[in-house]
Structure formats: structure tokens, C-alpha cells
Amino acid sequence: MVAFTAVMVLGLTLVLSPLIVWLWPSKKETVPTYRPTVEVQDEAGVLDSTALSDKLKNLEFRKQVHLAVLTVPGEDVSNLNDAVLEYARSHASDTDVPWVSTSNPKYWSDGLVILAVAPDSRKVGCYFGEDVKVMSSQEDAIQDAAKSQFREKDWDGGLVSMGKKSTKYVGKPRSDLRA
């Protein structure tokens, strides 16, 4: 009788152990996520700013960020980097937060992510504050996420794709950036 009971307990343990392991609380740490503050500066007049802003506000980043979108008008934009910087400097009072760092004007403000497109000049770029900076290969991936939509003149969709892709990299620990 004792042997039978021991076999039954052992069998029951073997049957239930996968369930116990599956239900056991994991020590894996959950990473907090943050929804961005968003501003849209549609200088080219190609966006549905309200709808785009609403979509971007639902993204989840690993750090608190201010997500700024800028469209640059004109077919003569030869250097988008310069155009975005010029806009940031000349429109400082028009933006929700300063885009250029007040402590060091050679850098973008901390917590800032800028997604920019010059539709008529076929230029796209993304820019990051020092504390949310990503590797250049990730910048390329973020920009590439929008290319097919931009080819179709889906500016809102392309910018949402860039935003979604940026959530994959922004705030990721440096040791994980290549993943």
C-alpha cells in the first residue's frame, strides 16, 4: 500500500510539474514603457496632423521622449540635416519644447526624437537627443521603415512606421543596441 501511494504521488507530481513551472512567478524584470509627448510641425502641408499625432501618442518607448515631426517644404532641400537644424534654431519659440540643447547648442535636447521628411526633395531623416541616441545603423533602419510608404506619398503612414521602428531602439541598453 505504501508503494502504491508513493507511485501515485510521484506520478501526480510528474503530471503537474509542467503546469507548476508554467504558472510559477517569473523573476524576469518587466521593462516600463512610456507614451511620448508629440508635436507635429507640418511646414510642407502634407499631413493630417491631428490623426498623425494621435497615432504617435500611442507608441510605447523605453524612456520618456518628446517626439517631434517636421516636414520641410521645397524641392531645393539639398541637406535635410541643415534644414532641420535651421528650423530648430529659427522656430525655437514655435516648438513645444526646445529642440536644441540649452546647455550645449551643438546637440539636440535630451529626450528628443525628431522624425523629418522633405517630401518634394525626397529626403528623410531622424535625430536624437544625446540620452536617447541610437547607432547609425538603427537610424538607417528607422528611415528605411518609411520608404515604401513615402514612395506612395503616404507621409502620415511613413512617419508612423518610423515612429514604430524607433521604439525598438530608443532607450535600449547600449549592450543590446546591435540586437
Where in this protein do the model-derived segments appear?
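A structural boundary signal for the start of the first folded domain, especially the loop/turn
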Residues: 1-114, 119-179
